[in-house]
From Swiss-Prot:
Organism superkingdom: Eukaryota
A GO term, aspect molecular function: ammonium channel activity
The protein's name: Ammonium transporter Rh type C
One cellular component term from this protein's GO annotations in UniProt: apical plasma membrane
Complexes and interactors: Homotrimer.
Name of the gene encoding the protein in the UniProt record: rhcg
Signal peptide: none
Protein family (similarity comment): Belongs to the ammonium transporter (TC 2.A.49) family. Rh subfamily.
Extracellular side: 44-74, 121-133, 188-194, 256-265, 319, 380-411
Length: 494
């Protein structure tokens, strides 16, 4: 038995081989060919994107192409698409030597993930039982982007510590788990979650955190020199923040009902985000005796309000209610970066590179709670009888559901997303821990040179790069910053 255990230890601790010349091309080619075959078998245009749209218009007495769903949904789709590829990608460029990996691997897994998501979500939500086909339109593309967002959130927890092959495997399983938990929450429990506080952010957050916990690196301090930012990398990350911040109202309203529901979701998210910024700046400044702002907080915590309002965005939460949610999220998220992230790494052994627990996981749970309370408190006097039925879709098998029952199912949906994130992350993390994926050694983490060809001047002048801004580390704060903080370390540990 002892020899077996020692053999396992030796197997998992063998020297890292980061040469992915064979594995990455094989995985990309095989999976893309598989997508082509599966799309050929299952995927077809829906009636609004098919050439038979002309006949559909005549049959349904539609007089103008403007009634095609494309013209209603495409602006929101484009905003969401920019968030996925530009917003998430650039938000993760804060590391001084991992910008290629942040944007490039974000591009890679999003491009694969959206194809797999169209299939998985199609099989669960829109498979025609008569033809066995999946009919897709512009709303399908939005939902696929939403699915990919969960995987990109998870990527933030393991940024710089995994290989592109591991990321593709993580995305394959992540999209699959997402489709299942989304079906359970939205279809079986009939919870409402237009902006994905539960389905996207809570699941993606805990999925990534659990994978990071399984892949814990006790010697990650060997790459400490890379675990920080330089001035220009923070500016690039701030570009991602601004794109996400500007387009988050579209994210939360993209698949809501036509008319007042979408209008209300935009207003609520707009106000919530604005409130979050002021609170984040206040807490960031107050936490330091010098009153200086921490760029980590400004890049990330300012977005937490958009995450937290995702579930309740289309509800009658009222404008001042949206401001309250943003106010609370700014406090909780910023305090999370100051106290909870160091605790997670030191005590729970969770190395959260981008601090997704503070930007996605915690605000996602807050969003689930806000959604449950708001749903349970809904009334005909506020919504109107028909609007109440329309907002919560109390039709068909759910026509007799009360608002209190709906609130309970909203809370149940949040629990489902956490369970899927943690359980799925544990299983997938165990698979990714196998020493066959070409992941970097501890001393080479957070360095683009492992997987990317870098410009000659970068290689020649690597040693002359300005010192990193160590305070911009999403996992651990610099000791002197904590010692100069208005919040004591003793209070943090208590």
């Amino acid at each position: 038995m002892g020899n077996f255990i020692q053999g396992c230890k030796d197997y998992f601790s063998q020297q890292k081989n980061t040469n992915i010349r064979l594995t990455l091309p094989v995985v990309c080619f095989v999976w893309q060919i598989a997508m082509i075959i599966l799309f050929g078998v299952f995927i077809r245009y829906d009636e609004e994107s098919d050439t038979h749209w002309v006949e559909t218009k005549a049959h349904d007495n539609i007089t103008s192409d403007i009634e095609n769903d494309f013209y209603f949904r495409y602006p929101s789709f484009q905003d969401v698409h920019v968030m996925i590829f530009v917003g998430f990608g650039f938000l993760m460029t804060f590391l001084k030597r991992y910008s290629f990996g942040a944007v490039g691997f974000n591009f890679l897994i999003a491009s694969f993930g959206l194809q797999w998501a169209l299939l998985m979500q199609g099989w669960f939500h829109s498979l025609d039982p008569q033809t066995g086909k999946i009919f897709i339109g512009v709303e399908s593309l939005i939902n696929a982007d939403f699915c990919v967002a969960g995987c990109l959130i998870a990527y933030g927890a393991v940024l710089g510590k995994v290989s592109p092959v591991q990321l593709l495997v993580m995305t394959l399983f992540g999209v699959t788990l997402f489709a299942v938990e989304e079906y359970i929450i939205l279809n079986l429990l009939h919870a409402r979650d237009a902006g994905g506080s539960m389905v996207i952010h809570t699941f993606g957050g805990y999925y990534g955190l659990t994978i990071s916990w399984v892949l814990y690196r006790p010697n990650l301090h060997q790459s400490k020199r890379m675990q920080g930012s330089v001035y220009h990398s923070d500016i690039f990350a701030m570009i991602g923040t601004l794109f996400l911040w500007m387009f988050w109202p579209s994210f939360n309203s993209a698949i809501t009902d036509h008319g007042d529901g979408q209008h209300r979701a935009v207003i609520n998210t707009y106000l919530c985000l604005a409130s979050t910024v002021l609170t984040t700046v206040a807490i960031s400044s107050f936490s330091q005796k010098t009153g200086k702002l921490d760029m980590v907080h400004i890049q990330n915590s300012t977005l937490a309000g958009g995450v937290a309002l995702g579930t309740a965005a289309e509800f009658m939460i009222s404008p001042y209610g949206a401001l309250i949610v943003g106010f609370l999220c700014g406090i909780i998220s910023t305090m999370g970066y100051i106290f909870i992230s160091p605790f997670l790494e030191k005590t729970l052994k969770i190395q959260d590179t981008c601090g997704i627990h503070n930007l996605h996981a915690m605000p996602g749970v807050i969003g689930g709670i806000v959604g449950a309370i708001t749903a349970a408190a809904a009334s005909e006097s506020v919504y109107g009888k028909h609007a109440l039925i329309n907002t919560f879709d109390f039709t068909g098998d759910f026509k007799d559901r009360t608002v209190l029952t709906q609130g309970g199912y909203q809370a149940a949906g949040m629990c489902v997303s956490i369970v899927f994130g943690v359980a799925g992350g544990a299983i997938v993390g165990s698979i990714l821990k196998l020493p066959i994926w070409g992941d970097p050694a501890d001393e080479n983490c957070f360095d683009d040179e492992v997987y990317w060809e870098l410009p000659d001047e970068e290689e020649e002048h690597q040693e002359s790069i300005p010192p990193i801004l160590e305070y911009n580390n999403h996992m651990i704060h610099k000791r002197q910053d904590l010692s100069e903080s208005n919040f004591s370390v003793e209070h943090c540990e208590s």
